[in-house]
A protein has these predicted regions:
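Short loop segments at secondary-structure junctions
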Residues: 104-106, 123, 162-163, 283-286
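C-terminal "cap" of GNAT-fold acetyltransferases
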Residues: 273-285
Length: 296
């Protein structure tokens, strides 16, 4: 019963124009008015529905999936409130769009959310405190180079462990492509991660990425902390580039395949037990194969 009460209070009801009562305090506060969204098409393929969450129950299901993966599976450090509610949430959730994939026929669970991505456009982020990525990386060059309305941050990507055969991530990217076209997005950015915080173990991978996938100077991105560790060593590149590439995390490989580039440095996130890179994709530079597959 306590869990249900907490979930009801932590429902981000301000998304629907109400007040938020936080945990045991009766204090409520007025939130920013909601910015009207453009109509986003709901995509149905077989048993799956891909859409933007537009109900508090859908958002809570996405947050529950995130919690199960980031905190239970990946062992991120949880706060007391998150342990009680079993939801992953932060202040950015209240102004972001939440892309979800629903399995309509998952046995025993109606309308199960099995995949999610959080989307934040630059004009929205600038009104509510900025991108999540800007808490780890200096995005000045990108913000100075693009109309903020044309920048889209991707984050909080996760897929249920029973659905990691590539299908759900493909569906999410189909929907992201629709979002890109709808809002005429010119650049994608976000944090892509290596699990763990031991930099030395990743010396080959980090050296390979810096040597082969660095951003051009005019939109270069720097870590907010000094991450020029001695791991960046060309001697680490004796191993075949292909052999290093195939060992990269799937999400990083995916971004690189479509034409992404990475930040000059990295950020160690001890709370999430990750080493983060900022990945940037200029949509005009998306590889032709993927542009034909998703954007045409």
């Amino acid at each position: 019963m306590l869990l249900n009460r907490l979930r009801e209070n932590l429902d981000f009801s301000h998304i629907y124009g109400h007040h938020l009562n936080f945990f045991f305090k009766s204090k409520s506060f007025q939130l920013e008015p909601i910015i009207k969204k453009k109509l986003f098409p709901k995509i149905e393929l077989g048993d799956f529905v891909i859409k933007l969450a537009d109900k508090k129950s859908e958002l809570n299901k996405a947050q529950a999936l995130r919690y199960s993966i980031f905190y239970k599976e990946k062992k991120a450090k949880s706060t007391f409130q998150k342990k009680i509610t079993r939801l992953d949430y932060d202040k950015i959730d209240k102004f972001a769009d939440h892309l979800i994939v629903i399995d309509k026929k998952r046995r025993g669970i109606k309308n199960k959310v099995v995949g999610t991505y959080r989307l934040i456009r630059g004009d929205i982020a600038s009104r509510f405190g900025g991108f999540y990525t800007s808490s780890e990386f200096d995005l000045t060059n990108i913000l100075n180079s693009y109309n903020h309305k044309k920048i889209l941050e991707l984050g909080r990507s996760c897929v249920h462990k029973d659905y990691r055969n590539g299908t759900i991530m493909n569906l999410l990217w189909k929907a992201i492509a629709e979002y890109i076209k709808l809002y005429d997005i010119k650049v994608l950015l976000g944090c892509a991660i290596f699990q763990g915080t031991n930099v030395q173990k990743l010396s080959k991978e980090l050296s390979y990425l810096r040597s082969n996938f660095s951003l051009p100077d005019e939109i270069s991105v720097k870590s907010l902390v000094n991450s020029n560790y001695p791991v960046y060593n060309r001697n680490n590149l004796n191993e075949s580039g292909l052999r290093i590439f195939v060992k990269l995390p799937p999400l990083i490989k995916g971004y690189l395949r479509v034409g992404g580039r990475v930040s000059d440095g990295f950020f160690i996130d001890y709370d999430f037990n990750t080493i983060d890179l900022c990945v940037v994709v200029q949509t005009e530079n998306i590889d032709k194969k993927y542009k034909n597959k998703f954007l045409n």
